[in-house]
């Protein structure tokens, strides 16, 4: 029997590449601003900046940092084969920077009254991996 086969399970999870130098710098306690300046593609540095700004009540700065980390992560997801949907597992450490940036983007959007963006971010995070929504508190 010939014919097409269909994958009924959906797309494979997308795993972002390791960025060992940038990760090592953050893990060693380097200032996230320094890491972001030296490794501007590294979403985790932007997510760290966004989280710190949000916790300090600097919502607009948090939004800007988070948006940068989010867009840098989207670029990398696309290069890794992501088609705009499908799982982005929280358990894979390189994915966490993007997912954390997405969460802070949603939180900051909600705080400044961007309800539609808040809802989009919340849905995107949960669709990427429910564990990410749980870990970041954006549910």
Give the role of each language-model region.
Residues 1-84, 102, 107-139:
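N-terminal alpha-helical interaction modules that lie
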